[in-house]
Amino acid sequence: MQKKVVQSASKNEELDPHYKRSSVPFPYGLPDYDAEYQFINHHMQQLLTRPVEGTHSASVHPSTSSTSHISSPSAFSVQNPNPNDAPFVGNIGLDASGFSSGGMSEYYPRSVSMQQSQDVHFQNTEIPYYHRSPSSDSFSPGVVASVNPNSNNSPTFYSNPPALSNIPIPLNNSPYRPEDAYFQLQGAGVKADINPYNLSPYSQYGPEGTAYSNAQAHHQDGAPLQRVCSAPDPPKTSMPPFGSAGSPSPNRSLNVSNNTTPPLSTVNKIIKKPKATTGKVKKRLPQAKRACAKCQKDNKKCDDARPCQRCIKAKTDCIDLPRKKRPTGVRRGPYKKLSDTSNNTKSTTASSGHSTQDSLSSKMLDPSSDNQFAMSSRQMDENGMAQYPSSAIKQELNLQPQILVSSASKNFQPNVTPPFAVHHDHFNSTSMDGVAVSNMDETGTSSAGSKPFNRKSRNRSFTNPVGMTEEHFLREYAQHSVANPSLLIHQIHGLPSEQVHGLLSHTELGNAMHNQPTYNESSIAAENVNNWMLETNDHENLSMQSHFEVPDLKMNHHDSSFFDRHIDQTAMPGQNQHGTVKNMETMHHFYPDVHNSEFPAAPNPVKSQVPYYYQSQAADDEEEDVPDHQPSWRGRIHSFSIATDSSQHVVERPCIHSLRGIHGQQDGGLEQHDGDHVNMLPDTHAEELAYTSMLLFHDIPTRDIRPDFNVHELVDHGTYPNFHQNQADSFKNHPFRQ
């Protein structure tokens, strides 16, 4: 029964050469073709060759196979459509489990296009195949038959088929490329209907690396071979095979058709290499310092040659325009030119004076020019004695005073706001740059003409109070000052809204705030600039009430991001309408000339010097009971302070805080009097903010502080050197730490 079915299938193929079996369904559901399907066919066609003698066919099954099946050409083998040619090897897939009781398995051998090729002897070539069982629509690998074409023995079957990666390589070990196979065919005179540069990665190759057509294979005599079974043709792709680096360029692609193509040597002649540039490359001429008229008009570079290359190409005249002579003498330079003819004499006189001074100053700086200057300025008498003219002596002697007076007259104007002046308007919205920064330039030199501090100040801004602190100490330690009170009225944060009223006597503070000194240009020298506050008029009849009046203490915004330096009266319990400045006996070592006897009658007597330390009338009555040299800490109203909530978090917040004064112990705790400042922050923040404020703003400066004081040194050492002498230098002994 089995033989009849097989023979009927073979008879159908013999009767109808165009008989095709049913197409194999795609196991993976690809729309065009199966990549694995084409990959296997590619290697199968590399293995199949025509044997020398004998007809061989694949065995049916170990249980049904015999030597008669192999010797008989009609026993389960695919017949060659061309009877004149020798038989060839066919590949038929069988069911590995044998025939089932329900009927025979459907065999779907892989598409193998047989092709006549050269006589190649090979042995033990493993041919993998796939089969499909009736109960499943998917393909599974079957057994592998080892065929020896030189023997009539039945092939050996292996139970474990090799994987696709173990498929045998082609007989020739040399790597093959599509273009090589194509040119081999063309050299042999074989026609081909494929483009070697248009092959897909799964294109078919004949034995020995020769390419063949998917649609029709040709023998050497031109007789076509029919395909054993139908298989989908792979689509044509224009991408080079595998995207290799050695793939041919698009310029090398050929339109291959059924017509005969010239051999490889002819193709190589057609491909012409680009010719090398002949001739010498002209060197660029050096660029001219002054271009010709045409190049100047076109705003182009010009070479030194005349005519230049651009003029030669444009066929124009190459002309150099005459240059304008540079003015000589006193009019040399644009800053000496004046359009008004009436000022020519003035400009000539001024320029001559400047040129004389410049030459003298330059010769004074250059020691090598002393002898020349001396020889040119003196005259030799008949006896060989040098005689200096009186004009030269007067000019040399008067040179330095003229420079000083001229510089002082330029920098100072009468009835102007003195440097570091205190703005009485507490609600002035002037920016910090116009108040504090404008008084000092980047080199540490006062804009009013004072001597430099020989130190560069850092950037001063709201977010860098350290720079403001250094600026504060630079002002205090100005040179050539008998009594420099700049610390007493300076603005701690550089803003006009914060004043320090506590360290000056009433008379000095009133004179400084209300009476601006009048400068006399003839008597002011550069080194006396810092002493402007000493030239004040005594006004003993000024009302002390007006000087120490506290303005309306209301919260407002100085700008969009910081609060003003004022608080509401409601935040100050027990505060009178007119606050007083509480002085401190312990500060007398810093200002020995300040004493309580200097203070005239005031609404509230003052005894200590602490900036912005407000005191109520009730506290003034108890002032007599307060011991002298008490450890009184400073108190201040700050709009913001920098503190650390944790080791990784640094905050800058608006706040109002102060250190509470220690007036005694009561029940083991701190006693707060009515006159003390109210701490507006929680106790957890008060310690950090108070200590940070002392580090940043130096609220109790002493003579031990240095002008180059660095706040970072304090942070490293963890101490603050400006504590009171009765207190320790460590923050651990702070009143809040007790």
Curated annotation (Swiss-Prot):
Gene Ontology molecular-function annotations: DNA-binding transcription activator activity, RNA polymerase II-specific; DNA-binding transcription factor activity; RNA polymerase II cis-regulatory region sequence-specific DNA binding; RNA polymerase II intronic transcription regulatory region sequence-specific DNA binding; RNA polymerase II transcription regulatory region sequence-specific DNA binding; zinc ion binding
Keyword match Transcription regulation: yes
GO biological processes: cellular response to phosphate starvation; cellular response to starvation; intracellular phosphate ion homeostasis; positive regulation of transcription by RNA polymerase II
Organism domain of life: Eukaryota
Keywords, alphabetical: Cytoplasm, DNA-binding, Metal-binding, Nucleus, Phosphoprotein, Transcription, Transcription regulation, Zinc
Biased composition (Low complexity): 55-77, 340-352
Amino acid composition bias (Basic residues), ranges on this chain: 323-335
Protein name: Uncharacterized transcriptional regulatory protein C27B12.11c
Protein species of origin: Schizosaccharomyces pombe (strain 972 / ATCC 24843) (Fission yeast)
Lineage: Eukaryota, Fungi, Dikarya, Ascomycota, Taphrinomycotina
